[in-house]
């Protein structure tokens, strides 16, 4: 049974949204600089909505990504990292995967549109998604400015363990190129050295990690960088993620006392 009459839902939603905005405006200094988002639940949303073709869920989820990034920009967030395609996702049915990669390529090109004035960077191995999609993604990202008020990382062909391995390999390769001895190579493997060779090198670690669809795990997302991140989970599937959900995540983050493992 409906507790709230349908005609009142929209006004009450807008009122709640306004109150959340006002509360966040009063605590702007407590907002995260970097938000990382696992956009989970596209297929489940499609099935629960009665669609046999799960690619419809991906398309609706893609539209939500650009919308969510605008929320971040409007809120004053400096950097957002969005998990679009993991290395594990590459094992899906070939037809489903091809549709997903096409949708991801389209949404990244939308994110990179000049009208947004966002600086966009890919994190992951584009060599895993095929030559043509990789070419389109590189072209789109290279067209964005290096200096901007809002930066976006799109994680495509990304695996957290793979990133750490790649960082260590890059670190050791640089040391070898400089003629390092075996002992010097061992000494070179430090927290700072690995951090400097991650895909996100030069960027702050995420302050807040958001995951939709009720799953409460990282699934390999930014394993190194999220060691001290705050986590926020919601039952909503990604296509159904609302602005008030986003504002609630920011509100909850601003109320937390970060301990950084201490």
Curated annotation (Swiss-Prot):
Sequence positions that bind Mg(2+): 40, 230
EC number(s) given by UniProt: 2.5.1.68
A Pfam family it matches: Prenyltransf
GO function terms (MF aspect): ditrans,polycis-polyprenyl diphosphate synthase [(2E,6E)-farnesyl diphosphate specific] activity; magnesium ion binding; Z-farnesyl diphosphate synthase activity
Alphabetized UniProt keyword annotations: Cell shape, Cell wall biogenesis/degradation, Magnesium, Metal-binding, Peptidoglycan synthesis, Transferase
Highest rank taxon of the organism: Bacteria
Biological process terms in GO annotation: cell wall organization; peptidoglycan biosynthetic process; polyprenol biosynthetic process; regulation of cell shape
Protein's UniProt name: Short-chain Z-isoprenyl diphosphate synthase
Organism encoding this protein: Mycobacterium bovis (strain ATCC BAA-935 / AF2122/97)
